[in-house]
């Protein structure tokens, strides 16, 4: 019985240690920078272009706020739009650490939106980042997890409206794939 308690304690302490190590690794490579675009604080990687990274997040933040507000204005009773409006917090956009396993992702349907901002060491194009962020908005608004048909339909709807209001410029990823953070974007729901 005593051995089980000791084993259990060691396992719990190991998990806590691994978590703290991850937190240290993450936050030791991240700094908070004030964007010149909107004077807001953004968490970005400690790199020479950190100011540019903060400004890039500020630019995409503005586009996403416009899109979410537009969607709520034209479809205020749509369940996905209502969920998106409720759960989207533009103040949780931040850059993630360099990790080939992750590009951009949403935590708990909008609790955090972690962005990959660099491909091959250079800041990504704002239109590509906007496409990726609209993909993340689709996850926030969609009730299910993953990429089911409802997700793709909502993603397409958001892209169409983003184009209509000038937030996103349509791009044919099938014709000209784009490298984004260790992966290739090869298609879009609009194709």
Q: Which role does the model predict for each range below?
A:
Residues 136:
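Walker B catalytic acidic pair
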Residues 1-130, 140-191:
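Active-site-proximal or metal-binding-adjacent scaffold patches in catalytic folds
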């Amino acid at each position: 019985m005593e051995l089980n308690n000791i084993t259990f304690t060691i396992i719990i302490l190991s998990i806590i240690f691994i978590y703290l190590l991850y937190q240290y690794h993450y936050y030791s490579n991240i700094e908070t920078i004030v964007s010149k675009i909107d004077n807001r604080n953004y968490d970005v990687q400690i790199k020479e272009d950190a100011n540019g990274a903060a400004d890039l997040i500020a630019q995409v933040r503005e586009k996403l706020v416009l899109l979410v507000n537009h969607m709520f204005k034209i479809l205020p009773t749509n369940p996905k739009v209502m969920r998106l409006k409720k759960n989207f917090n533009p103040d949780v956009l931040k850059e993630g650490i360099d990790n080939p396993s992750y590009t951009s992702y949403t935590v708990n349907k909008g609790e955090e939106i972690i962005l990959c901002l660099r491909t091959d060491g250079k800041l990504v194009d704002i239109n590509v980042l906007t496409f990726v962020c609209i993909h993340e908005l689709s996850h926030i608004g969609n009730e299910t997890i993953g990429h089911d048909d409802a997700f793709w339909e909502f993603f397409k709807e958001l892209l169409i409206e983003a184009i209509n209001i000038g937030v996103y410029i349509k791009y044919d990823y099938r014709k000209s794939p784009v490298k984004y953070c260790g992966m290739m974007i090869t298609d879009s729901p609009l194709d």
